[in-house]
Amino acid sequence: MLSATPLYGNVHSWMNSERVRMCGASEDRKILVNDGDASKARLELREENPLNHNVVDASTAHRIDGLAALSMDRTGLIREGLRVPGNIVYSSLCGLGSEKGREAATSTLGGLGFSSERNPEMQFKPNTPETVEASAVSGKPPNGFSAIYKTPPGIQKSAVATAEALGLDRPASDKQSPLNINGASYLRLPWVNPYMEGATPAIYPFLDSPNKYSLNMYKALLPQQSYSLAQPLYSPVCTNGERFLYLPPPHYVGPHIPSSLASPMRLSTPSASPAIPPLVHCADKSLPWKMGVSPGNPVDSHAYPHIQNSKQPRVPSAKAVTSGLPGDTALLLPPSPRPSPRVHLPTQPAADTYSEFHKHYARISTSPSVALSKPYMTVSSEFPAARLSNGKYPKAPEGGEGAQPVPGHARKTAVQDRKDGSSPPLLEKQTVTKDVTDKPLDLSSKVVDVDASKADHMKKMAPTVLVHSRAGSGLVLSGSEIPKETLSPPGNGCAIYRSEIISTAPSSWVVPGPSPNEENNGKSMSLKNKALDWAIPQQRSSSCPRMGGTDAVITNVSGSVSSAGRPASASPAPNANADGTKTSRSSVETTPSVIQHVGQPPATPAKHSSSTSSKGAKASNPEPSFKANENGLPPSSIFLSPNEAFRSPPIPYPRSYLPYPAPEGIAVSPLSLHGKGPVYPHPVLLPNGSLFPGHLAPKPGLPYGLPTGRPEFVTYQDALGLGMVHPMLIPHTPIEITKEEKPERRSRSHERARYEDPTLRNRFSEILETSSTKLHPDVPTDKNLKPNPNWNQGKTVVKSDKLVYVDLLREEPDAKTDTNVSKPSFAAESVGQSAEPPKPSVEPALQQHRDFIALREELGRISDFHETYTFKQPVFTVSKDSVLAGTNKENLGLPVSTPFLEPPLGSDGPAVTFGKTQEDPKPFCVGSAPPSVDVTPTYTKDGADEAESNDGKVLKPKPSKLAKRIANSAGYVGDRFKCVTTELYADSSQLSREQRALQMEGLQEDSILCLPAAYCERAMMRFSELEMKEREGGHPATKDSEMCKFSPADWERLKGNQDKKPKSVTLEEAIAEQNESERCEYSVGNKHRDPFEAPEDKDLPVEKYFVERQPVSEPPADQVASDMPHSPTLRVDRKRKVSGDSSHTETTAEEVPEDPLLKAKRRRVSKDDWPEREMTNSSSNHLEDPHYSELTNLKVCIELTGLHPKKQRHLLHLRERWEQQVSAADGKPGRQSRKEVTQATQPEAIPQGTNITEEKPGRKRAEAKGNRSWSEESLKPSDNEQGLPVFSGSPPMKSLSSTSAGGKKQAQPSCAPASRPPAKQQKIKENQKTDVLCADEEEDCQAASLLQKYTDNSEKPSGKRLCKTKHLIPQESRRGLPLTGEYYVENADGKVTVRRFRKRPEPSSDYDLSPAKQEPKPFDRLQQLLPASQSTQLPCSSSPQETTQSRPMPPEARRLIVNKNAGETLLQRAARLGYEEVVLYCLENKICDVNHRDNAGYCALHEACARGWLNIVRHLLEYGADVNCSAQDGTRPLHDAVENDHLEIVRLLLSYGADPTLATYSGRTIMKMTHSELMEKFLTDYLNDLQGRNDDDASGTWDFYGSSVCEPDDESGYDVLANPPGPEDQDDDDDAYSDVFEFEFSETPLLPCYNIQVSVAQGPRNWLLLSDVLKKLKMSSRIFRCNFPNVEIVTIAEAEFYRQVSASLLFSCSKDLEAFNPESKELLDLVEFTNEIQTLLGSSVEWLHPSDLASDNYW
């Protein structure tokens, strides 16, 4: 109580006594919603409200509402700029955020065709739990999805509902029209054709949530309805929060395939349609993806009769469904010459391309010249070669069409998966059913769909998106389709949403990969490449290696390998597929590596990662890869002979029971979902449970090894809602993770080896060159495919890569192929490496673009999504922003073809502008090529050794890859998807397993299991699986060149081999390194570019890179965190990524600044990590901090997820070692620099989206000061300005104010709060003092253990110092800080000091401020750390941000001493002391709650009113201050104002509704408080006015000051006639009479006139009694009526007449009323008093004008 007295010392005694008396009574202080709560709310909103499109009826549900939901959530974003060529929309961009969407998607899937459409004879009832879960989650029954029932093939065909029947959103359908599908309702995927017929790939919904169209597309792709396939194999277990497609065991799968239901399953694309429609763009009539059911997807025939045909008859529907995939449709459709004009793929591609596709996918890296469509075709033929050739799509066009449907399907699957955690598998299942036409598709729709869809898609976009093809043939999306799909192969709707990581789960919806290929074939290579460019980045972003993006970026290749290499990791294939699509399409020759990866798992590793990446996406090869790996079954050809029943090998449903349609037994390679992680094709598609044929078997191990697939799932789940994916992830993770992880790790090693391999590098260079040229043409497509950049984020684009690392553990397989060599660090070993090496050159710019687009997306999504979510909204947004940035800039194409363009960037070294994309293909490919590649390629290699050797950067890349993969598996997977819920989900469920395994192995020694043991165990298991998979080397063999590069070495390094800092760091650290490596890559790329910054593009790329990465990392993580405890894990992983990369980057002077910023971004992204990292930073070396941060992030994520790896101690140790290594390598003041960088980066974690500032953390502190508003600036101008694209991505991330803020907050509460206990706060304070990133990291590590605790007291600062300075940090900033674990304090000069504080700042409104505040600091620091050139660039980038930056902190703010003990805030202090600027600063930046009350219950308004600060009172009221806020003693602000005699304030308060009648609890009223006569009189009059006066009150009488009668003439008087009362403004017609007086003259008495209302329709008028008129006229009534028929006569009751007349003020003759009886019921006749009657009565009327009166002086 006493402590509060000083606060009120200056107030009157009454205030002192009462306040002091009440001071300690009870803390009435209002605590803002925790960030975690907010994020949760947002996430929940996202999950629950998937944007309408998720909500569909049972049959409609089959259109993959989940995908729609994903799409919807990001619809705005998609429309904003993610629409790529041909109106392709990245479904990932679509809101994958709501659980409802997921639910809907799941339901849709269930209703769609998980019935025995394929196998009418087979009655399959999805597991009841799954069905129930779907219903429960979705809130709606699985809709015919509950059970597969025998249905005659014919019925099933007819059963396939049209888009409308399926409940396709008409909007989705409409969207298709933009695709120009020529009315084709379905997409026919040539490769899907045979498969569809045999395996019914058409019913294979790759991504339930991501792409409703993808399933439909696949179905549509099937020319004929696939054999009736029991579709209910996979029903969404959790329709809402977590959509899990139930993938029945292989025994179910078989029936699935046999069904001849090729009827295209149409998925209506509610909102997802924009994303999913890209796949849909296939004009094929049978476009099952439209329905959300791929051709191979079993669909209820009754539900999708239109799809049933798999023919064009349903084209309109499909088209409608495809609407969301406008551009994509074109891409997909071209391959199939079906009626749908979109099927541009030559007929030859169907068979020719199919074989070629297979071939290319098998050896895409080897045959760079292979056209995407061809490679996809090859894949198709590889899988469904027989199917395609002898399937329903024997002709290339059909194959093309089939391929197109697959992309749609894939998209849909990806989207739906993303939406549904588990729905994608469902959709895939459904799609499979549809595709069964040509090949019996196993009920595991994924596998089947992959077969048929993939074949077609391969034909269409041979190397394009085969990444998903493995898990789902549909993976092979054409480039444009991928962009539309966002991640065509991985989950057609996932390209944009890394969150679609969900598909990394066992579900085998990787099939979507072929989709891009499909369109590309038919359409044009350039278009496809365009799509691929965008798709590839996203593909890359997907865990899958960039299948399609191999050419453009090694990342793609690597990703491809990853997807092929590991079943689940093959999921990255989808991403790679998207990449690959673009790459293959634009430079088939370059892309072949990607395809090759899938096609030839073992060879691919040696081949460029791109091939592997493409391969992952490639339907045929990736399938075994990820299938086998995920299933643990040997990968077998996904495409079976047409006559061969497609039965996925026994799939351990336990694994995929929740997450994916594909059974766990089926190795579901991570498909490249939108932009995040790979999508896992449904195991159903392959007899062996693999999506790709046996020849791909070698590959699956590697791709599957990539944990990126898992993280992808996690990301998707993030988008969908953490809850949704968790179940899926958890069950899925055990097997899938193990398979995925191990192969991934192995892939990583391979990737690394490959990258390190000069030959590989050369090949990469070649591919990149080819890709570069092709991709450059693809740039336009990329621009169109803005969604794809999201998809590209992690994979194709540098930023994307980083993001991919974060988002795309699954995507890593894609990266692993070629470009993903650098990517493995992000996605997985292989993926990270493949993606990262190319990243340095191309990716810095590209990723910056993508980051910018992602950021912009994030911003848009934050606005739209957030809050969801928003997840929407978040990951998507980030990716989108990145893409948008790329689009805006010349480099748009670059991001789009990041896999390809990135090499160009890297080629020239650092400062390659986007325009230079072509120039740097080689460096990109090589990964350690030029200086730019030095930094970036280092990442590309991602091998610690290579990284170190190159730039110290390469050191990071490897750990970065693993870290990325781990991060992906742990939640890093979806940068964008992270925003969604997939990443978090993956983190906690699927990812948590990987992380659990990895961390248990690598971090077990020091692991701190702070969170629930279950989560810890899961995370560690996940880690272990990732680890083992990467080290496995089995299927990852192909990826191994890239993947194994990082895998064995990096994996162990990540695991705990701390020999090599990047790799020596524990798995966690490695992950962090990988994450950071991505960032570092950005950083390095930026730095290298900085010298070349002459073009702002380069700076922009850097910024974009950061932004995209950060947004991906942060928004997804935040959303994830808010959605689930796992969310923090994701965030942490991301951070760690940054951290690890940062360390590597530190090796290079330029690298360090960017890296730290990236790290900061990451940290901010996961505030959870921040505390932990902060703690670590203190004790750890600064250089080590990045790795440590990454590991810490991972740990924090794990902790949040329930797995708490060794925290501080381990991280510190790693950091120290890393510092030693890095400081030696960097030659910079490594440690201090790192600290500064880390500190700067941490504050910038959120603001990092801003320019290179984050990249240049050197001036974090100084910059924070001046650039507190960076976040806002970057949020606002970043999107628009190329210089700020990165920031734009970052601000959303950093401030999360618009998109990321909400998501971040949501995720943050669960992470950061728990990790910010007093100890952590103290550490934060230390960090604040030292500005040491290491300290921050250390704190983060500690925070990880305190995350939960911190979550609870997010608003309470733990340390005194923190409390002391807390008031200096905007609430939002604080909120963001907890996310990053930093406490940002703005100096008087506007500088934001980064202070680590465990306490989470006020959660809700402070978030926006936080980013703003935080940003400036990182910028400053970056300037300090970065070279002069970079520094110059920084300002360039930051100036736009500054434009948007919020009010800078006034100098007084730092001088004000806030009495925290009394519960006082800076706002209250400033209000008391009259610091208006500080008050405005606090209000505008939401630093304090305007209604925050201190311990005595007094708020800022009390203080200002008591002291008479009128302006401050006005500001407070304008910002929503409670005018009647009551202190604990009942004192209101009005009481304070009256007591202190502030009359104007009293007036103001009363005008705002202050209640003057309220008294204090002691009974004092305002009238008793007055001290002046003036105040008393005013209050008396006011109260009298309120209650009125008594009649006898003399004082109440009115005083009239004059009368024309009483006043002398000479005095001013009022002349009534001079200005008679009356309406002054009348119509022109009445103007003449306005001032006229009318006089009636008569020789006889005038008849009485009555003003009466006779009709309700008319007002009162003047009436005469008819009796009076007749008496005067002396005539009868009849004669009067006859003579004057025009005179109106009315009848009224006498009683009514009397009532009205007696009450009339105009009637004064009481005598006249004596004749009337007030109770009489007789009627009276009235005649209206008119001029005619007047004349009749002999009266004359004259008008007197006032002017005449004046002149004539009548008066």
From Swiss-Prot:
UniProt disease annotation: Microphthalmia, syndromic, 2: A very rare multiple congenital anomaly syndrome characterized by eye anomalies (congenital cataract, microphthalmia, or secondary glaucoma), facial abnormalities (long narrow face, high nasal bridge, pointed nose with cartilages separated at the tip, cleft palate, or submucous cleft palate), cardiac anomalies (atrial septal defect, ventricular septal defect, or floppy mitral valve) and dental abnormalities (canine radiculomegaly, delayed dentition, oligodontia, persistent primary teeth, or variable root length).
Basic and acidic residues bias (residue ranges): 775-785, 1076-1107, 1166-1175, 1253-1279
Top-level taxon of origin: Eukaryota
Protein role: Transcriptional corepressor. May specifically inhibit gene expression when recruited to promoter regions by sequence-specific DNA-binding proteins such as BCL6 and MLLT3. This repression may be mediated at least in part by histone deacetylase activities which can associate with this corepressor. Involved in the repression of TFAP2A; impairs binding of BCL6 and KDM2B to TFAP2A promoter regions.
Compartments, record wording: Nucleus
Ranges for region Interaction with BCL6: 498-514
Annotated source species: Homo sapiens
Keywords recorded for this protein, A-Z: Acetylation, ANK repeat, Chromatin regulator, Disease variant, Isopeptide bond, Microphthalmia, Nucleus, Phosphoprotein, Repeat, Repressor, Transcription, Transcription regulation, Ubl conjugation
Annotated stretches, region: Disordered: 309-345, 388-438, 557-641, 737-760, 773-794, 815-844, 1071-1187, 1220-1328, 1430-1451
Protein name from the UniProt record: BCL-6 corepressor
Lineage summary: Eukaryota, Metazoa, Chordata, Craniata, Vertebrata
Gene3D superfamilies, A to Z: Ankyrin repeat-containing domain (1.25.40.20), BCL-6 corepressor, PCGF1 binding domain (3.10.260.40)
Effect of residue 1706 to D/R: Slightly inhibits interaction with PCGF1
Cross-link (Glycyl lysine isopeptide (Lys-Gly) (interchain with G-Cter in SUMO2)): 786, 872, 1256, 1413
One of the record's GO cellular component terms: BCOR complex
Residue ranges, compositional bias (Polar residues): 580-594, 1238-1252, 1430-1447
